[in-house]
Amino acid sequence: MKSSFKSEYPFEKRKAESERISEKFQNRIPVICEKAEKSDIPEVDKRKYLVPADLTVGQFVYVIRKRIMLPPEKAIFIFVNDTLPPTASLMSQVYQEHKDKDGFLYVTYSGENTFGYQ
């Protein structure tokens, strides 16, 4: 999944920004969160997040759910490098395993209707 953030900003600018963020906020992780292309789920109002290192993937999913005002009958799935990270994983662990060369962690979210409602 190609990130629109990556296509909008050159590598050098992204790397410089992530380094600046990491120096200023050492216990935070720079995350770019974007909706999957073909998903029918709402678009999130912002895509750059600075999350606490001890936040779990499940807690991050909750933050995204709230920001897009997703109804309870809709599911949301978070992908990092096209894989579903375990809900109990710490964002710092996911970051160490999957961070991009530019220093950001790229997360894609998608949804599907779990109960068949329209």
From Swiss-Prot:
Classification via InterPro entries: Atg8-like, Ubiquitin-like_domsf
Family designation: Belongs to the ATG8 family.
GO terms under cellular component: autophagosome membrane; cytoplasmic vesicle; cytosol; fungal-type vacuole membrane; lipid droplet; mitochondrial membrane; phagophore assembly site; vacuole-isolation membrane contact site
Molecular function, one GO term: phosphatidylethanolamine binding
Species the sequence originates in: Candida glabrata (strain ATCC 2001 / BCRC 20586 / JCM 3761 / NBRC 0622 / NRRL Y-65 / CBS 138)
Entry PTM: The C-terminal 2 residues are removed to expose Gly-116 at the C-terminus. The C-terminal Gly is then amidated with phosphatidylethanolamine by an activating system similar to that for ubiquitin.
Keywords: Autophagy, Cytoplasmic vesicle, Lipoprotein, Membrane, Protein transport, Transport, Ubl conjugation pathway, Vacuole
Subcellular location per the Swiss-Prot or TrEMBL entry: Cytoplasmic vesicle, Autophagosome membrane; Vacuole membrane
Predominant location: membrane
Pfam assignment, any one: ATG8
Lipidation (Phosphatidylethanolamine amidated glycine): G116
UniProt-recorded name of the protein: Autophagy-related protein 8
Role description: Ubiquitin-like modifier involved in autophagosome formation. With ATG4, mediates the delivery of the autophagosomes to the vacuole via the microtubule cytoskeleton. Required for selective autophagic degradation of the nucleus (nucleophagy) as well as for mitophagy which contributes to regulate mitochondrial quantity and quality by eliminating the mitochondria to a basal level to fulfill cellular energy requirements and preventing excess ROS production. Participates also in membrane fusion events that take place in the early secretory pathway.
Annotated site residues (Cleavage) in this chain: G116, Y117
Gene Ontology process terms (BP): autophagy of mitochondrion; cytoplasm to vacuole targeting by the Cvt pathway; endoplasmic reticulum to Golgi vesicle-mediated transport; lipid droplet formation; membrane fusion; piecemeal microautophagy of the nucleus; protein localization to phagophore assembly site; protein targeting to vacuole involved in autophagy
Annotated propeptide span(s): 117-118
Bilayer topology term: Lipid-anchor
